[in-house]
């Protein structure tokens, strides 16, 4: 089961008696270590259902699940391999009743949150300001602050105003039986922190927790991990301080600093052999990150040979840069016999808006290409419309889903009619959908608006 692992990887896999931090440099086989450790735990007799492997994206979780399946076969389906937020959904659906949430609660997307925050602010705020408030509220939640705590810590009038809006926003979420993305971490943390019976349940359920991309965890995720593993501290955190790039959304390297303090028996294993790049590339990368402050110093090395030297090219403009890149690709293909396939080349850029010049240059050269990323299938308007209908079917208190459903397709129901319905629902402390069935509604709405709503 451990064939093909180097000595450092074997050390990380075989240490199962306490807390373990695996410092995994880029391309050092961290996913391999995680999946082999899952297999090793099962080999030693642990129930697959007692193992949780947590990562940050659904794509990474799917890849990990597939690689675990290759190692342990059908047992992989019993291992909890998921994102932090997927774990949060499961915890709140199972135990959220103590927080006043039904198991059928709705999970709001970014657009829903934006609309509710605008409504909480009085409905007259411009979109850009509402987005800024949304970002601030999200950051506060990632720091573990509720509205009252945010108000107490506010530095100025602007932050105090946002904290007040946050309180109204939270009231609306509660009324709608809905949660946002950040709640999927903060609510499980509240469950574990405030309800001993829930904490005992999850600590007894999970015998070992593995966390991928640990350097990207924020304060609430760290606290959640601590409460999940309890005093036994049976966990494996896999990360790299040199790859921490999400500080702007709450990720903190303090979580790496805290581990040796909170878990004095922490075993630290460094994975320094890179299996992806040549020595020339690694030397350049080591020189770039060399001046960075180091929590745990390490130096990556490769046994793939020296390789081609790294070239740095000065360009006059974005268009010139794109043309040079395309010319380089064409030159490399022309020099090889047989020429490599187009899919053997990649162009990396920092942000999506930088793709356009490269796309134009590739089109001019008649080179086939594929842009990774872009709009998610679930972000398409028609898919959001369909999902809103399903959400409303499952949870009739989901006001954001109602507002999207009632407007698609168009039924002649305007903003004023919906505002009147909203006022009626607020006055009678009910959801928008439930308000449609109130015998008092006809007296509150114009006949035409009422007919359109009842037709819905």
Segment roles from a protein language model:
Residues 1-103, 107, 176, 199-200, ...:
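P-loop NTPase Walker
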Residues 3-14, 18-22, 33, 52, ...:
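Conserved helicase NTPase motor core
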Residues 18, 46-50, 75-78, 112-113, ...:
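Short glycine-/polar-rich loops that comprise or flank the Walker A/P-loop
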Residues 22, 26-34, 96, 102, ...:
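Helicase P-loop NTPase motor core
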Residues 109-177:
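Coupling/switch/interface segments within P-loop NTPase motor domains and analogous charged loops
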Residues 141-147, 288-298, 426-431:
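Proline-centered turn/helix-capping motifs that create local helix->coil transitions or kinks
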């Amino acid at each position: 089961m451990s064939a093909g692992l180097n000595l450092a990887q074997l050390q990380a896999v075989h240490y199962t008696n306490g807390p373990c931090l695996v410092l995994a440099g880029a391309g050092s086989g961290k996913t391999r270590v995680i999946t082999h450790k899952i297999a090793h735990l099962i080999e030693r007799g642990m129930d697959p259902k007692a193992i949780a492997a947590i990562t940050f994206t659904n794509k990474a979780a799917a890849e990990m699940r597939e690689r675990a399946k290759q190692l342990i076969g059908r047992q992989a389906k019993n291992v909890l391999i998921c994102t932090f937020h997927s774990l949060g959904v499961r915890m709140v659906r199972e135990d959220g009743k103590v927080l006043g949430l039904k198991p059928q609660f709705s999970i709001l997307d970014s657009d829903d949150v934006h609309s509710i925050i605008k409504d909480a602010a009085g409905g007259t705020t411009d979109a850009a300001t509402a987005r800024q408030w949304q970002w601030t509220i999200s950051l506060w939640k990632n720091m573990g602050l509720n509205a009252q705590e945010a108000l107490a810590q506010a530095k100025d009038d602007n932050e105090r105003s946002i904290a007040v809006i946050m309180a109204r926003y939270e009231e609306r979420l509660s009324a709608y039986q809905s949660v946002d993305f950040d709640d999927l971490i903060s609510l499980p943390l509240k469950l574990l922190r405030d309800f001993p019976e829930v904490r005992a349940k999850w600590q007894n359920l999970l015998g070992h927790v593995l966390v991928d991309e640990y350097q990207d965890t924020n304060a609430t995720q760290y606290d959640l991990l601590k409460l999940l593993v309890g005093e036994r501290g049976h966990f494996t955190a896999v990360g790299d301080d040199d790859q921490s790039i999400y500080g702007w959304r709450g990720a903190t390297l303090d979580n790496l600093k805290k581990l040796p303090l909170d878990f004095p028996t922490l075993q630290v294993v460094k994975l320094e052999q890179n299996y992806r790049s040549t020595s020339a590339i690694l030397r350049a990368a080591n020189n770039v990150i060399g001046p960075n402050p180091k929590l745990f110093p390490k130096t990556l090395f490769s046994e793939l040979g020296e390789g081609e030297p790294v070239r740095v090219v000065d360009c006059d403009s974005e268009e010139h840069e794109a043309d040079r890149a395309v010319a380089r690709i064409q030159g490399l293909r022309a020099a090889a016999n047989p020429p490599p396939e187009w899919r053997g080349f990649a162009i990396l850029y920092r942000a999506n808006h930088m793709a356009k010049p490269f796309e134009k240059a590739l089109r001019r050269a008649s080179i086939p290409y594929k842009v990774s990323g872009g709009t998610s299938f679930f972000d398409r308007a028609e898919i959001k419309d369909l999902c809103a209908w399903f959400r409303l079917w499952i949870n009739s208190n989901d006001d954001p889903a109602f507002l999207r459903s009632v407007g698609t397709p168009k039924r002649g129901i305007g903003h004023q009619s919906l505002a009147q319905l909203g006022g009626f629902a607020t006055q009678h402390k009910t959801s928008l959908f439930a308000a449609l069935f109130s015998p008092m509604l006809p007296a509150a709405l114009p006949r035409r608006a009422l007919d359109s709503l009842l037709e819905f």
